[in-house]
Amino acid sequence: MLQNKSYVRKTRAGKIEKVVKEHYLRDDIYCGAPACTVCDTSAARLSPNASTILVLDTNVVLNQIDLIENPAIDNVVVLSVVLDELRNKNLSVYNRLRALCSSPVRKFFVFSNEHHRDTYVKAMVGESPNDRNDRAIRVATQWYQRHLGSAVRILLITNDRENKRKAVEEGIFAETVESYVKSLGQPQLLDLVVQPASEDVVMDDVEDLRPSKKKIIYSEHKPMSEITAGLHRGIYHQGKLRVNRYNSFEAYVGSESIGDEIIIYGRTNMNRAFDGDIVAVELLPQDQWHVEKALSIAAEVGNYLRAEDEDEDVHLVPNSSDDAPRNASVQGPNADASLNSARPSGRVVGIIKRNWHSYCGSLEPMPLPAGIGGIAHALFVSKDRRIPKIRIQTRQLGNLLDKRIIVAVDSWDRLSRYPSGHYVRTIGEIGDRNTESEVVLIENDINCRLFSAQVLACLPPLPWSVSSEHLSDPNREDLRHVRVFSVDPPDIADVTNFVHPGTPLDDEASQRGTSVYLVERRIDMLPKPLTEDICSLRSDVERLAFSVIWEMTPEADIISTRFTKSVIKSCAALSYVEAQARMDDSRLVDPLTTDLRNMNALAKKMRQRRIDRGALTLASAEVKFQIDTETHDPLDIGMYQIREANQMVEEFMLAANVSVAEKILKHFPFCSLLRRHPTPTREMLEPLLRTAAAVGLDLDISSSKALADSLDRAVAVYFCSGDLSPPEYLHYGLAAPLYTHFTSPIRRYADVIVHRLLAASLEISKLPTVFQDRPQLTSIADSKDVLHNDLLHVTKFWDIMPVYLNYRHRNAQMASRASVELHTIIYFRKHPTDTEARIVKIRSNGFIVFVPKYGIEGPVYLTAKGDNGGGEWVVDEQHQQVKKADGSVSYNVLQMVRIHLEVVEPQPNRPKLQLTLI
């Protein structure tokens, strides 16, 4: 049966055109119920013992997905009209529902009501799309009732009063979410139910029992129409809000319209915005802007703490450019400072797109009696200090007080000091190492599930070995006769020989994006048979590789470069320590050791040449733990030692990445995946310049060459070559005009993409279709994180790929850091110690120190926390010094001090490492 859909649209050229689409209807679409006597039961997904089959409307799925994911909710028919609406409204929820539908252990069935002759409905004249879709849901529910008869009850679940009223009038069984959940006899499930806004908990009952305290706390958000108009007129400014990780009362919004970051100070000015929200901001009058000063943040926060009855554990200053405004600081006693040095400050007037998701943390008991029916109200405190407390209601308060739990945000009324949310699930006991490690993974959206059977089926059977087909492949060079040894050389495992585009293995790798390295474990991007066997370049074992081969002069000048897929047989698999020991042992003169020394000599010349071009040679503190093999607790902590062998490998890997970047860009100028490092702005470097000046150094920051030994805060990112002009390809830190990632396809999906591009440039294989077809969206877009806020508009593969990979790369880094922080807390809780530290930043009530022995950076307070140091301590900004008013004691930037490190818990369930001056 054929139906025609027609509509008119406006083209980009401004023309109006009529579009006609054919819509085919069928009468042989299965219902999915085993009890059916008409349909083919081999296609049944629902339980044969089901007494009730649920049909959910769109808003129920949108708002109750946490409940729906609970195993108690099963035997569900998911209508295609609901899926279509979800795809347009919330891709994250859409993907979660699709996962339920494809899960072999859940009983969810997708019914294509929009393509069934008896359930498709046309929109009536004057009927809104929402009303038409509600009617389609009721029609499909009625069809199921007639189709299955008395064999099973069909129940429509909806919280829409009008939809429920019409359903009952039409003879359909219908219930609200709460009513149905109560009928299940599992009271704990009610904690998962999101209350409709109109039925939310009364503010008086939760926040204050005195009606006089009920007042408007936040300004009303502007409607989108007013926000859009204000953005066009330049009254409002759009950007992503980022909350200071160490001061949750301070945030900033990067604004392209004014070319600067707008400081948002205080919860009132944040106006219910969460970290990561896309917001509209209105600038405050200039006399209210904050002036850049080296002042105490904690003191200013204290004013807000008293004003808002909060009790946050606020650190002295942020220590990452990702966590705080570039030059943000609060206005201090010198209020008459020149406004020329003030930073733009503003307030949030509207939320353009929310970044709400689930959060890990614990409950803070509230001095309120349990409600009727055992309902208790509690405040949830997130592990992420940037997130405000969230109020929830629960029927299992006693079981949750000592647990790490997950809570989702539902709403935030302007009459409420806190947002409202609901309990999702329990992670485990507070303080348990496994529980806290799982929190790290959840907070950073790390996929640690086991590889599915479909993914593992893509792997070749073990034991695997190089076959005669590989050796006879004209596109693969036999290098087994060449002396090859692995200290991670330019011969890179040929991962793409086993990871083919469009397979479940490739889909899984693309969604994971990268391997994640925690202190006690590694979460692989690819299954272990590949990472630890088939693609591991072992000694005396034949392996497939993708090789970069250079011809070089003794001065490390590259004469020629070629690339080939190869077969190698490594004569040695050396660790960095083993390679260094060989090079250092003058008694060894064997060919392998001689090769190592020759390569090291070349690497030194290559490194010097990079430095001469202006490459930055900055070392970051990498902490190394000694872990107990039985308890997995840290036994010792120290800095990771970098050897010449590490630098040798680094140079050849960098050279390989540069060579591959040049090759793929030459062949695919518009669709190469490259990596760039933007040049930092002067504002980013101001703190460095002040510090250098204080110790008598005058830095020239006009070029990377002049700034080769300085810090910068720009972050290297992936990008598609077709999206930027060639001058923007620059990798500032490496002083390389072109750069990509090729050398680690085992642990980075970016390298897998580059391998495919390189193979296509060599005509070894065809370029995957998706690389050429820019409007296509791949399964990568279906991953949860690509659905956050600013990525929802992405509709092109090459638009989404770099953004997604950058997101995954950053999350992996943040998870690694969080794991280090967790194990640092575990270690110093048992081993408090005294050690040396170097002052790196000065503040009026203390300073930030770096502890070289442990790679730790943190605040040291000279005054009581909350005291801004006024009177007793004075800051000399010119000399980067904090001193007593009488001049008897002073501390300077880069000065060594002795400190005490110990773990304290100023707030329940929030342990932190405290640094105290001795």
What are these regions (language model features)?
Residues 57-64, 79-81, 157-159, 177, ...:
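Structured beta-strand/turn binding interfaces of compact recognition modules in eukaryotic regulators
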Residues 62-64, 69-72, 83-88, 94, ...:
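Eukaryotic short linear interaction motifs
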Residues 199-496, 502-541, 873, 879-892, ...:
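Charge-lined substrate channels and their catalytic hotspots, especially those that engage the 3′ end
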Residues 384-386, 411-414, 429, 433, ...:
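Electropositive polyanion-binding surfaces
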Residues 54-55, 77, 155-157, 173, ...:
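Beta-strand cores of modular interaction/reader domains in eukaryotic scaffold and signaling proteins
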Residues 66-69, 89-91, 168-171, 179, ...:
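Short coil/turn segments at secondary-structure boundaries
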Residues 50-58, 72-74, 152-155, 159, ...:
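Core residues of folded domains in eukaryotic genome-function proteins
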Residues 1-217:
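Noncatalytic, typically N-terminal accessory segments of nucleic acid-processing enzymes
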